[in-house]
Amino acid sequence: MLSEEILKRAEDLARRCEGRGTPTNTGFLTPAERYALEHDQALREANMVFHGGHPDAERCIAFFLPDWMEADALDVSEHIRAIRLTAAFGEPGHRDYMGAILGMGVGREWVGDILVEGHEAIVLCQPSVLRHLLSIDKVGRCGVKAVEIALSEIPVRGKKTEERRFTVMSPRLDAVAAGLFHLSRTEVTRQIAAGLIQLNYTECLKPDAPVKEGDVLTLRGTGKGKVAGIGGSSRKGRMFVTAELYK
């Protein structure tokens, strides 16, 4: 679905929640779709929370709650389930697991993160497709065994990050991306022109686009990072930037 369709659907769900006084929810959203919802003016008054089944989830479901309901009253396990797939041999990759899931006719919006570690993977999904995913017995060329596990059994791995500190003349996309990804401004300019750099999960072709604290920069094929802080200046008048590069 396009971002506009996602926003329209979310706004409809928010109105339904308000009108009926009962919770509503989307399917699993990409980080870009979540960002769009978080910054949609039509949803600024909505009691909206996001859950992905584990603390560091990238793909999340947006829940719209009525005014009488607190966020901690939401039972996430009623909406998100987890499956552990264990390979009999070999170590299938993320693409292999995704191929097996899509091959069963399960839409991507029904599936959350796929956490791959060695010969195992944990798949987050909505309850309506749980039975289908539990029937998976082969991923790529590897036989697998699928079992449901509780969300509490998902290992807490945490995001591995590397702190980056650098200075810029001004907090614009090309300058911040160069410091974050350790690239020359010339190379970054080429990457931006090629559409390989995203600002807050959206392709940005403007080298001078302003970057602020909390923004996420993504370089396709390399990784992504988040701007943790911008402020202060060096003796030469350059601004200090602190960022976290996700590994």
Sequence positions of predicted segments:
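Basic (Lys/Arg-enriched) interaction patch that binds polyanionic ligands
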Residues: 170-221
